[in-house]
């Protein structure tokens, strides 16, 4: 749709680029895996290139945002007789090519596959948990970041954040499935695997799992309200959903390790 402001792309690239860089550093210090680290460095480099290109072409804005700004300014002028200055864009500057943002996740996919293969036996289970977990945590994190962007771009339609919330809800059962896949969290809950805390971590995981989908559902319901404050309320709920989603994923990984 090309309607989210170009600054949101900067937010995404900086946030996930730093995460990737941190992952590479930790991997090199703790348990180096050559393919994983090499492609992790590639992710950081590709993210940096996309960020630089986006900054160089910032005056172009994005097509959908330009159209919306012009429409709103025209409407205000017609209703009030006041010719309000719209945000100015330079049409002579080429837009940022969105395809450039695909390189980092493609390189990241290779790094994740390498990480999954190295994680242990069975390989298929490790790969599934690694890839599904990355998609799930990425979706909920992206949704929370986008919720904050509505403060910067208040005229933005709700379709983008609703789409991300929907993706989080869609991915939740798959995340649950791969964490239950034997040997999984059912073994922790039954006591076959000792979590070291008398079963408390297992029930904490259950609480995090249930709370995550409830918070995502509450976020979706909140976004049906017409008031603009509903977006801010949804962002607050997504804050909590991130905490419980990471609890759902990381507690299971730590316990099953």
What do the PLM-derived regions correspond to, one by one?
Residues 186-197:
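Membrane-helix boundary/interface segments in integral membrane proteins
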């Amino acid at each position: 749709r090309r309607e989210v402001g170009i600054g949101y792309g900067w937010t995404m690239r900086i946030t996930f680029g730093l995460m990737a860089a941190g992952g590479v550093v930790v991997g090199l210090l703790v348990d180096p895996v050559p393919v994983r680290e090499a492609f992790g460095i590639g992710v950081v480099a590709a993210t940096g290139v996309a960020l630089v290109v986006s900054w160089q072409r910032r005056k172009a804005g994005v097509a959908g945002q330009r159209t919306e700004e012009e429409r709103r300014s025209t409407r205000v002028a017609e209703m009030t007789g006041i010719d309000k200055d719209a945000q100015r864009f330079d049409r002579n500057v080429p837009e940022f090519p969105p395809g450039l943002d695909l390189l980092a996740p493609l390189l990241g996919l290779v790094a994740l596959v390498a990480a999954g293969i190295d994680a242990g036996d069975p390989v298929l289970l490790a790969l599934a948990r690694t890839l599904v977990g990355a998609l799930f945590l990425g979706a909920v994190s992206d949704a929370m970041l986008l919720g904050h962007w509505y403060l910067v771009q208040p005229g933005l339609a709700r379709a983008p954040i609703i789409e991300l919330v929907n993706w989080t809800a869609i991915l939740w059962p798959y995340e649950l499935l791969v964490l239950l896949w034997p040997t999984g969290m059912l073994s922790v809950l039954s006591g076959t695997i000792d979590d070291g805390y008398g079963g408390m971590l297992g029930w904490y995981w259950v609480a995090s799992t249930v709370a995550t989908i409830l918070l995502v559902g509450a976020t979706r319901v909140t976004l049906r309200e017409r008031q603009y404050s509903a977006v801010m309320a949804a962002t607050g709920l997504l804050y909590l959903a991130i905490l419980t989603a990471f609890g759902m994923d990381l507690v299971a990984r730590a316990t099953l390790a």
